[in-house]
Curated annotation (Swiss-Prot):
Transmembrane region(s): none
Record site: May be catalytically important: 176
Keywords on record: Hydrolase
Protein name (record): GTP cyclohydrolase FolE2
UniProt source species: Macrococcus caseolyticus (strain JCSC5402) (Macrococcoides caseolyticum)
GO terms, biological process: tetrahydrofolate biosynthetic process
Biochemical pathway: Cofactor biosynthesis; 7,8-dihydroneopterin triphosphate biosynthesis; 7,8-dihydroneopterin triphosphate from GTP: step 1/1
Pfam families: GCHY-1
The protein's enzyme class: hydrolase
EC number: 3.5.4.16
Family: Belongs to the GTP cyclohydrolase IV family.
Lineage: superkingdom: Bacteria
Catalytic activity: GTP + H2O = 7,8-dihydroneopterin 3'-triphosphate + formate + H(+)
Any GO MF annotation of the entry: GTP cyclohydrolase I activity
Length: 292
């Protein structure tokens, strides 16, 4: 058995099974390596989307730095074998500035870069990120940080945006109208999870507060909003407001839809409301889609 100097890192590595590299026969210089992805012949089908998913990358959203989860893809013509996937992250890195600014203008710039370096006709991105914002308690007006989940989605062809949407997911309180109606006192209530996918005119301008206006439609139509901090006077207000505004999932869905119809920058939407029922082991849900 070979003896190694265990006082050195290399010796310890070999003691634990590491071996010296072999002398290979394949080229080590990039220019001499075979580029399989760039092979050209009939590969039978073009591909709508090919790229990477679950890329975690720092983003900046409304003054907060958070982690974004990216899916980035391009089209692939049928006479091309594959894409150079390293160029995807290079396209993101080219726009890094203490994180990537999470807004549609920046995402469009990233996609145009990606599309150009890939020599493809379109590019698509989806970014999931936590959105943090100030939330004030209803009576004492104490500030704390609230949050919602966002997904920014966009596709470009050339210099033109062909679709653009925002998905927001937020939690609310819902109090059961049936429980209130049939009970001598009290009513069961629970958290509701509301998800809105709002579509926008691809090349249209959005107001600076477009996220806030969509979130407001989701929250104010519930029995109550959720708050990070509640003192006793706040808790009394929240409890009584919920009792005064009972909502089935069907009610909440329709009320949110009515508000979204009135937002002129929203061209269509899909809403889902899901209640984590406090008196059942299952959830209740409702969903609708609408195009203006």
């Amino acid at each position: 058995m070979d003896q190694y100097n265990l006082n050195t890192r290399e010796g310890r590595w070999k003691h634990f099974g590491s071996v010296d590299p072999i002398k290979g026969t394949k080229p080590t210089e990039k220019e001499k390596m075979t580029d399989l992805q760039s092979s050209k012949k009939d590969f039978l089908f073009e591909i709508d989307h090919v790229g990477i998913k679950n890329l975690t990358y720092p983003v900046r959203l409304d003054g907060y730095q958070t982690a974004g989860t990216f899916s980035l893809s391009t089209h692939l013509a049928k006479d091309e074998k594959g894409i150079n996937m390293s160029r995807i992250l290079e396209s993101v890195e080219a726009h890094y500035d203490n994180g990537l600014s999470l807004d549609f203008d920046t995402l469009k710039t990233v996609l145009i870069t990606l599309q150009t370096v890939m020599h493809q006709k379109d590019a698509t991105v989806d970014v999931d990120a936590k959105w943090f914002f100030d939330r004030f308690s209803p009576v004492t007006n104490l500030r704390a940080i609230g949050h919602a989940d966002t997904r920014f989605s966009m596709t470009v062809e050339g210099d033109t945006t062909v679709n653009k949407s925002l998905t927001l997911t937020a939690m609310v309180t819902t109090l059961c109208p049936c429980s209130k109606e049939i009970s001598e006192y009290s009513a069961h209530n629970q958290r509701g999870i509301v998800t809105v996918k709002a579509d926008f005119a691809p090349e249209g301008e959005l107001p600076a507060n477009f996220k806030e206006r969509i979130l407001e439609a989701m929250e104010v139509n519930a029995s109550s909003m959720l708050y990070p901090i509640l003192k006793r006077t706040d808790e009394k207000s929240v409890t009584e407001r919920a009792y005064e505004n009972p909502r089935f999932v069907e009610d909440l869905l329709r009320l949110i839809a009515a508000d979204l119809v009135e937002l002129d920058f929203v061209t269509g939407f899909t809403i889902e409301c899901r209640n984590e029922e406090s008196i059942h082991q299952h959830d209740a849900f409702a969903r609708l889609s609408y195009n203006k």
